[in-house]
Amino acid sequence: MSKNLSIIGAGAWGSALAIALYDNFDTIYLHAHTQDEVKILKPKYSALYPNNIKITCDFSKLQNSKDILIVTPSYAFSEVLEKIKPLISSAHQIAWGTKGFDTTKRCFLYESFERIFPNRNGCVISGPSFAFEVATNKPTALVVASVDKNTRKHFAKLIQTTTIRAYTNADIIGVEIGGSIKNILAIAAGIAAGLGYGINTQAALITRGLAEMSRLGVSLGAKNSTFVGLSGLGDLVLTCSDDLSRNRRFGKELAFNHSIKSALYNIGSTVEGLNTLELILSIANKKQVEMPICEQVYQVTQGKITPTEVVNYLMSREQTNE
């Protein structure tokens, strides 16, 4: 078999990875969701990458690749795994670049993977990475996490390029938590930015948000050290600091007193932080972990408090040790 890669998900992140990785493979099969998407994308890729990137919506093409990378929205993750399961052989290896929780099954993505593929080692690729910068070859560092050493080393080698530096980590729980909670905290950062607060406020939100992320992660068995790495602090700083982040832009829309519906319309794409909010807080409640920033973001999205009241509440909480 030639050295091919199948990427399932032709959105911004899947497309960026295809462009960034095309020199590493003979052929990359970029799987769109529908034939209409194929018709839109095919002329563009045929002109720029005529021999390397093939646009398709035919899952039978998975037979041409040993390695599969899933880059779909988190809500579609389980559905995609179920669809491809009959086509997967022992020769295939699967990783995903999706961040967030499986909200349809109310669990981590790796748990959905283990449920559908019980005898395989899951692998997640995460870290601070705006799709546009990856696609335009800006130097980027990613983390590849799996409980299996060979699996994480395999995918780290596959995605390493002159502009992508891949690190490995055994803590798949911590990496997935970081990639999920940072989206919620970015909404909070967007609210603060939209209200006109300064860098001091942003720094406080990032630092205290990291504490919330770490507390929940450790309660679920993750390593504290993971949260000061690329998938924790790295992705959190990125997502909270720049308007390339959809979640941050969504928070700014809320600060401008736009409704959830109009804010989502203005963003024009998935806001993962909004999708995972309720589930994260449900888990935190069961583990008796305090997450005041995430809780206040949830209250805003439910229309129970205003964006201004979020900051007022957080600043007036009872004093505690750091």
Curated annotation (Swiss-Prot):
Binding positions for sn-glycerol 3-phosphate per the UniProt entry: K99, G127, S129, K182, D235, S245, R246, N247
Biological pathway: Membrane lipid metabolism; glycerophospholipid metabolism
Keyword Lipid metabolism tagged: yes
> Does the keyword field hold NAD?
yes
Per UniProt, the enzyme's principal EC class comes to oxidoreductase
Question: Which residues participate in NADPH binding?
Answer: W13, H33, K99, A131, R246, E272
Give one GO biological process term.
carbohydrate metabolic process
Record-annotated active site: K182 (proton acceptor)
Where is the protein situated, by its record's location annotation?
Answer: Cytoplasm
Q: Which reaction does it catalyse?
A: sn-glycerol 3-phosphate + NAD(+) = dihydroxyacetone phosphate + NADH + H(+); sn-glycerol 3-phosphate + NADP(+) = dihydroxyacetone phosphate + NADPH + H(+)
Q: Which UniProt keywords apply?
A: Cytoplasm, Lipid biosynthesis, Lipid metabolism, NAD, NADP, Nucleotide-binding, Oxidoreductase, Phospholipid biosynthesis, Phospholipid metabolism
Gene3D superfamilies xref list: N-(1-d-carboxylethyl)-l-norvaline Dehydrogenase, domain 2 (1.10.1040.10), NAD(P)-binding Rossmann-like Domain (3.40.50.720)
Q: What is its main location?
A: cytoplasm
User: What's an example GO cellular component term for this entry?
Assistant: cytosol
According to its UniProt record, the EC number is 1.1.1.94
Query: What are the disulphide bonds in this sequence?
Result: none
Name the protein family. Answer: Belongs to the NAD-dependent glycerol-3-phosphate dehydrogenase family.
Q: Which HAMAP family match?
A: NAD_Glyc3P_dehydrog
Q: Which PANTHER family match?
A: GLYCEROL-3-PHOSPHATE DEHYDROGENASE, GLYCEROL-3-PHOSPHATE DEHYDROGENASE [NAD(+)] 2, CHLOROPLASTIC
Q: What does this protein do?
A: Catalyzes the reduction of the glycolytic intermediate dihydroxyacetone phosphate (DHAP) to sn-glycerol 3-phosphate (G3P), the key precursor for phospholipid synthesis.
- The name under which this protein is listed is Glycerol-3-phosphate dehydrogenase [NAD(P)+]
